[in-house]
């Protein structure tokens, strides 16, 4: 994200098909500290490598058993790029520290993103819920 300004990304997202993503999951018992370290690694890689990521914020439930990640991308290409950059670190997260991974995507994905999800997402397309934009304050 260091090569493109945040203002430029926001403007591009307004004229393209921005995607907002929420990832949900469960932290394995006794694995909270390892989970936090791996989440920090995912954030580090995202900061260093991604060019079309607008948001990538991690949250943990008050009892330390669940997490959510709020994500936003300029477009489908941004989410594809992000997935390629963090693939190995994400695999470590879910093989060692977390499970029950579910994803919600708000926005209209490109065919390339749908193909990627069908082949690589946990549970395939069944682990992802897609919601198309209907109407809002800026529409």
Predicted regions and their residues:
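Amphipathic alpha-helical coiled-coil segments
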Residues: 91-95
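Short S/T/G/P-rich N-terminal loop/turn motif that feeds into the first structured element of a domain
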Residues: 1-67, 74-85, 96-139
């Amino acid at each position: 994200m260091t090569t493109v300004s945040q203002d430029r990304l926001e403007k591009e997202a307004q004229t393209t098909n921005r995607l907002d993503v929420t990832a949900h999951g469960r932290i394995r018992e006794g694995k909270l500290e390892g989970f936090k370290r791996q989440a920090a690694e995912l954030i580090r890689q995202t900061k260093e490598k991604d060019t079309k990521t607008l948001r990538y914020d991690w949250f943990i439930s008050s009892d330390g058993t669940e997490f959510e990640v709020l994500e936003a991308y300029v477009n489908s290409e941004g989410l594809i790029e992000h997935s390629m950059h963090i693939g190995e670190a994400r695999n470590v997260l879910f093989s060692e520290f977390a499970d029950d991974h579910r994803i919600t995507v708000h926005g209209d994905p490109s065919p390339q993103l749908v193909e990627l999800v069908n082949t690589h997402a946990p549970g395939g397309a069944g682990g992802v819920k897609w919601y198309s934009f209907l109407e809002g304050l800026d529409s």
